[in-house]
């Protein structure tokens, strides 16, 4: 699979949109372990950076972008423009919080402009 370009802007320098393929998305859902949640709760009492949560959210975003690229490639696109993130948290039961991140944008076929 060729690399899919993903940008947050709607235009790419030295390229033109040959065809708009359509909307694409990629979603990832993760949770911390019960021990991780407990340790995070203890750290929250004293304040400061929540490194475990930061790492989890960043990994979730990376997975969402990978899924976005796979979706775009499956439709024959070579780029995604206007990429954005949406995220949320929900309770999976028994106090287990799940972090959800969706990356979305518009799949296009870009051609180089000489």
Curated annotation (Swiss-Prot):
A Pfam family it matches: YbjQ_1
Superkingdom classification of source: Bacteria
InterPro entries cross-referenced by the UniProt entry: UPF0145_dom_sf, UPF0145_YbjQ-like
Similarity field: Belongs to the UPF0145 family.
Protein's name in the database: UPF0145 protein Acry_1752
Species per Swiss-Prot/TrEMBL record: Acidiphilium cryptum (strain JF-5)
Classification lineage: Bacteria, Pseudomonadati, Pseudomonadota, Alphaproteobacteria, Acetobacterales
